Amino acid sequence: MLQPKRTKFRKMHKGRNRGLAAGADVSFGTFGLKAVGRGRLTARQIEAARRAMTRAIKRQGKIWIRVFPDKPITEKPLEVRMGKGKGNVEYWVALIQPGKVLYEMDGVPEELAREAFKLAAAKLPIKTTFVTKTVM
């Protein structure tokens, strides 16, 4: 699963997830899966969606993952009282704003790409839409 090789600090503040996304255009492939809603994707969810797409296109074409989980989420163990410091890092997430292109695909017909993205979207907790590259 995806996670940073090394970070400057082990733990991070919760922070806020406001604004609109950078990276709102399909830039590598021909088709893309764009976030409509706001939320966060865990490394497991990103990987599950990638696997679903890869199986759907039967390993033809190419897939780009445009998001990376770079925020550590901590949790305290079960039945531990409050206080006594921040919990341990349990998983990594990517913060997603509306408009962010999550995945891109190339080298497959549009119908197959739509089907693959539909399967991938079912694995994700945020609302998404299918987009194509616009040629200027």
UniProtKB/Swiss-Prot annotation:
Q: Name one GO molecular function term.
A: structural constituent of ribosome
Q: Which domain of life, per UniProt? A: Bacteria
Q: Does the keyword Ribonucleoprotein apply?
A: yes
Name the Gene Ontology biological process terms: translation
Gene3D superfamilies linked: Ribosomal protein L10e/L16
InterPro entries membership: Ribosomal_uL16, Ribosomal_uL16_bact-type, Ribosomal_uL16_CS, Ribosomal_uL16_dom, Ribosomal_uL16_sf
Q: Does the keyword Kinase apply?
A: no
Q: Which GO terms describe its cellular component?
A: cytosolic large ribosomal subunit
Swiss-Prot/TrEMBL keywords? Ribonucleoprotein, Ribosomal protein, RNA-binding, rRNA-binding, tRNA-binding
What family does the Swiss-Prot or TrEMBL record give for this protein? Belongs to the universal ribosomal protein uL16 family.
Q: What is known about what this protein does?
A: Binds 23S rRNA and is also seen to make contacts with the A and possibly P site tRNAs.
Describe, as the record does, how this protein assembles with itself and its partners: Part of the 50S ribosomal subunit.
- NCBIfam families for this protein: rplP_bact
Protein's recorded name = Large ribosomal subunit protein uL16
Q: Which gene name belongs to this protein? A: rplP
